[in-house]
Amino acid sequence: LIFFKERRKKMNIPMHRFKYTKLTKEQIDKKLIPTAAGPQCVSEFSGALAGKSLKIVTRDGPTLNYTFKDKRRLVLSENGGIAVDSGYGALTLKQVVFFSHMIPKTQKGYNVFVDLDTNLVTVFEVWLSSGKKYPILDGKEIIVDDREVQRQIYFGYVEVSGQEPPQKLHHYTNRIEGKGMYWKQDTGIETLEFYASVASSNFVELTRHADDLGYCSPSDYVLINDNIFIYDRTECEFSGIFTLFVADLFTETQAGVRLGFNEKDELEYYMFRGTGKVVGQLAYLEPFDDHGDRLMVVQAESDPQTPGKGQRLVYRPVRYFQYMTDEEVHQAALKRTSSFVSRADAPQTMAGFNMPFTDMLVGKEFTLRYDNGGPIRHYKITEQFKLKYKEDGETQWHEEEYRAYEADEKLIWFSHILTDSKPRASVQVALDLINGLTTCIHSQMGTKYFGNETSYYAIFGVAEMEGLNPPQYVRHELTNELVGHAFSWTYTDQMSSMHLYTTPHSHSWTIFTENQTLGAQWCAPCIYVKVRDGVYILVVNEEACNGNEMCIMINTKIVHDCGFGFSGGAGGVNLGLVGAIGRHIGCYDVKHFFGQKAKVKGV
């Protein structure tokens, strides 16, 4: 197995950009042959089930008759059918015995959690090459990749002669929602997990990946008792690999399994133990009588079951994102480039609770000089919504629409299109009228993946203006001060989302459902700039999603943001507005996991 290698090369391509192989059913059949022997494990397997037999009865699922020959071989009969011999592995965590096995010559297996104190059982059936159909947001359906591990969860019990079946079984839960954990497996793998939604979770691979980026995957949470829960995630739209474990919050320990194919198409099927630490808790905002005991799913219209077997809430945005070349986007921009025009499909729909515009720049002339050979721009502001600018060395002034906010005391935040730019570009400018510092976020259409995605970078400098005496060395700077924090942002009374600042280089957003339960998530790389104490710039492009950029200034003192959206596509290029009122929901203590470290990452 790969974790026994002395050193595994770290993945340095973001998972949402990596081109995973479209493994066929036949290829997967061959790769799964070793699973007939059961999983491997660094820790010693448990013999708690050796020599025993269990009849597991599930609600709305199979009846599983197990005979455990020893601690590595079992015999299974499903629903009274033919007995099958297979390898397995078992681990214990307090009173819970967890065992995992695949069924030879199939792409199917079971992962079973047995509570020896109550005889209650949770069963995860897993399979590959599902041919499963899922709806996507435009109303169409897609067939998921064969390599994506599917799961179906059944709740049940161990049948005991002379005892009545229990009325209450294990169940789904929102009790874990909002919790954050650090885990270190016996394999050496280190992971941060943020359980920010009842249907999804964020995870940061601290050892597998070269970059500290957060990702989102559909997840399930099952409550065994007040301190023991079961968690799973499937890396849908990425490798399709499946991670599952039982955890005890009293001792902050876990026992689990990992099944699937990594980015090198290598089989990973191993069990693990781990130790961890709770790193924080976010508030969850659904009604007090909502206990999260129902699965949140999106149902495919063609699936006859309700909900369909294996159905789950999966956000697959890139599946309906229309690819455009750089030149196609530019031709669309020549036909239509708009600034701050209200349309139903424009980012102004995200500005219902925006901050007011300011006229503090009207009548001012100034020069913004950026470091290290960066641009030098001269400005004349004669109106509240129109400005003139020219690049250093130009003789002709360009006139453009602009919008400006006073985001903090005498701190101006404004934006405009760069005239006739190719690719189309805009600038978002922080101008401090107290100390003379400025930061420019340069945004333009196009990445190396899509012409209709945006890209951006930050440049730092000073302002030359009457009454200002800017410093020579002090600048605004990139920061990690927001890392771990979560805010809800309400753009209109009908539109709210939670933003979680997962790492110094990434950010996720989670959609609130009707009763404020947190549901679907997506994530992307980003940058954070500190402008003042408590005031920050956040820039994110919704990569492998819709390609739109959000560039906002967050004032944590008033819990309000304001800013701009930049996007382009077949309808042209648009510079719009973003603004929301917020609530601080909590924070994870995770900053110390990031940055330059003396230790060498990897396993």
Model-derived features: positions:
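Short, Lys/Arg-enriched N-terminal segments with co-localized hydrophobic residues
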Residues: 1-10
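Short, solvent-exposed coil/turn segments at beta-strand boundaries
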Residues: 46-52, 67-74, 92-96, 113-122, ...
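Short beta-strand segments that buttress and anchor functional surface loops
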Residues: 54-58, 75-78, 98-103, 181-185, ...
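Surface-exposed interaction/gating patches
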Residues: 45-57, 161-205, 209-213, 357, ...
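Contiguous, well-ordered beta-strand patches that form the walls/edges
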Residues: 81-113, 208-249, 393-429, 514-558
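Large eukaryotic, non-enzymatic subunits of multiprotein complexes that serve as scaffolds/tethers
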Residues: 12-38, 52-60, 79-81, 111-113, ...
